Amino acid sequence: MGGGEGIEVRSGSSSTKLAFGERITHAKPPFSISQIKKAIPPHCFQRSLYRSFSYVIFDFIFASTFYHIAATNFHRLPHPLHYLAWPLYWFCQGSVFTGLWVIAHECGHRAFSDYQLVDDVVGFLLHTSFLIPYFSFKISHRRHHSNTASLERDEVFVPKPKAKMPWYFKHLTNPPARVLIIFITLTLGWPMYLAFNISGRFYERFTSHFDPNSPIFSENEWLQVHISNAGIVAVWYLLYKLAAAKGIAWVIRMYVVPVTIMNAFVVLITSLQHTHPSFPYYDSTEWNWLRGNLVTLDRDYGILNKVFHNITDTHVVHHLFPSMPHYNAMEATRAVKQVLGEYYHFDGTPIFKAAWREFRECIYVEPDNDEGASSSSKGVFWFRNKL
């Protein structure tokens, strides 16, 4: 996956790759969001209910096919093939589930249709089926889009300044510990974020997507959190009944492992879109909405780009115009490159190599403290890894 290493920036009609350690341009952009929007064909902002549903149906056909093959054929396979078939099913089904996760996430952005009720019903059913509290996540994710790359207000994968790093972390930077951290992050990171705000924005009190009194939510969002929780309870009850009827092992093989694969992809995708050794974070003295949202990176997941409905390689446009449907984002990305110039970022590094690099290099953030640093750069924080 990926067509080359190094972060790609544009200059006019050509593109160049930054050398490792070279920083992106972080000066305030010389264009506005309205100028970017003018470069995009108007039809890219149009949402088609029928076309959006076609992607849901398409994904359900694939998911049903994979389920049918596994449920009706795997027990007939010779014993050695049995151990190859199940991991293949888990990867394929988890990938399709990730595509459905992306569609539900688009519903939360009002990118599915022109009808909010339709968007919320579809998004609620899809996300709830994966044990995700739809409305609760919709609210916190909206905050992420409103505060991207803000050191104080971004909602998820917020890097810590060096002074706030745990004392023991310096013992976790060796390769074996890094492998363990990556594994735990991918498998448990998503549910731990939802349940306990792990890797989320710092709040003074307990924070959870399942607690309507969490500081994430306002008083008028209380009912939405309870509706989300009721949906999760219903799915847990359904899983309990399935386990009673078919056995826990069946539920784990057919549902739990693919959902875990989906969770891993969600963490991998969302973390790598805003984390790179060349990327800054801003404190309140330097941050603004456009500047923060341009700290976003398109990446290449190969054929999985299509399976994931291009959320991976059109993430820059998605952050600038989150209500744009995914099926128009590729055309919009091509259109905005000329306006964004060196503010458009793409990294074709093979994705697992990129993940290893980012986990190794992006440990904490600090501003430049040398004497040559300007006063404005004091509010610009860069990733570092020397503890």
From Swiss-Prot:
Q: List keywords of the entry alphabetically.
A: Fatty acid biosynthesis, Fatty acid metabolism, Lipid biosynthesis, Lipid metabolism, Membrane, Oxidoreductase, Transmembrane, Transmembrane helix
Biological process, per Gene Ontology: unsaturated fatty acid biosynthetic process
Instruction: State the source organism's domain of life.
Output: Eukaryota
List the ranges annotated as motif Histidine box-2: 141-145
What family is this protein classified in?
Answer: Belongs to the fatty acid desaturase type 1 family.
Q: What does this protein do?
A: Converts a single cis double bond at position 12 of linoleate incorporated into phosphatidylcholine into conjugated 11-trans and 13-cis double bonds. 16:2(9Z,12Z), 18:3(9Z,12Z,15Z) and 18:2(9Z,12Z) are substrates for the conjugase to form trans-Delta(11) and cis-Delta(13) double bonds. No activity on the cis-Delta(9) double bonds of oleic and palmitoleic acids.
- The protein here is known as Bifunctional fatty acid conjugase/Delta(12)-oleate desaturase
Source organism of this protein record: Trichosanthes kirilowii
Gene of this entry: FAC
